Amino acid sequence: QLHEVSADCGLLRRINVLDILYQNDLHRYTAKAYQPQAKDDEPRTTDILHLNDVDPLPASMADEYPLFEAGDLAVSIRKVDLVFVFDPDTGTVKWHTSDPLIMQHDPDFMGDGWIGIFDNNRNFMKRGRMLEGSRIVAVQPHTDSVDIRFPTPLSDPFYTDTQGKWQPLPNGNMP
C-alpha cells in the first residue's frame, strides 16, 4: 500500500497498489512473483510486489512530461520488474514498462521527459557477470525511448544484487 501522510504525520490517504494494477489491467504482472525458475527465490505468497520506491512529479518539472501531470507518481515494483506512473487521485496508470528491467529500484523524474531507474539487472549467479552488471536506465515515456546512462563504454561495470539508489551529480556524473 501507498500512504500519503500530512506534515504532522496524519494519514491522509491509503492506496492499494494491487487494486491499481487490477483496475488498469496490469495484474498479469503479478504472475512473475510466482515463477522462481526465473530468479533464485522461492515462490512468493507474501510481499508479492515488493514496492520499493515512489517519486512524485514536481510541479516545476511537469511541463517536461507530456503524458503526465504534477503530482502523478512513479512507482517501482521490484518482484514483478515493473515501473509505472499513475494519477493518485483517479488511480489511472498513464504509462508502464517492465522491459528492460530486472528487479529495479528508484525511478526518478530527471527532466526533459526522462525517468531514471536503478536497474539491478539481477541474475542467478549473484555476481553480475551473466547480464553485464547493474545499470542506470533512462526511459522517455512520450517517445518510447530507452538509454543506458551508466555504465558507459568508458567506465567499469558495477553490480548490486539487491537494493540500489542512484542520483545525478551537479556536473552530470552518476555515482
Task: For the regions a language model picked out, list residue spans one by one.
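Histidine-/acidic-rich catalytic cores in large beta-rich domains
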Residues: 1-175
